[in-house]
């Protein structure tokens, strides 16, 4: 009887997680559309925007895109989040942080070091996947 209860609890929690991820993907899609509109407004606006605003908008767009791709990959790979997608998101988020907040040189250097560590982790992760094949 215990096995059936464990299986039932796992199934219910899996359904709750799936529904939450579907809702999250809808919200992220709305934000992605909003960011697309903002990006188009930056391009065709007569106002002068700094290049930082435009680049920040592009990177935020890619963050939304990567999160949506992560959710899609979750459903396609039998309810599993691949590690490399989280690393991609981390690298993109740190690049955005460097672009937006680059006043303090030491912080920028630390962010760049964190990006280097993430790239090394991505390389190690990809090498492990290649060895499995």
Swiss-Prot record:
Pfam families: PsiE. Its main location: membrane. The keyword Membrane applies. It is a multi-pass membrane protein. This is Protein PsiE homolog. GO terms for cellular component: plasma membrane. Keywords: Cell membrane, Membrane, Transmembrane, Transmembrane helix. One of its GO terms (biological process) is cellular response to phosphate starvation. InterPro entries: P_starv_induced_PsiE, P_starv_induced_PsiE-like. Belongs to the PsiE family. The chain crosses the membrane at residues 13-33, 55-75, 81-101, 105-125. It is found in: Cell membrane.
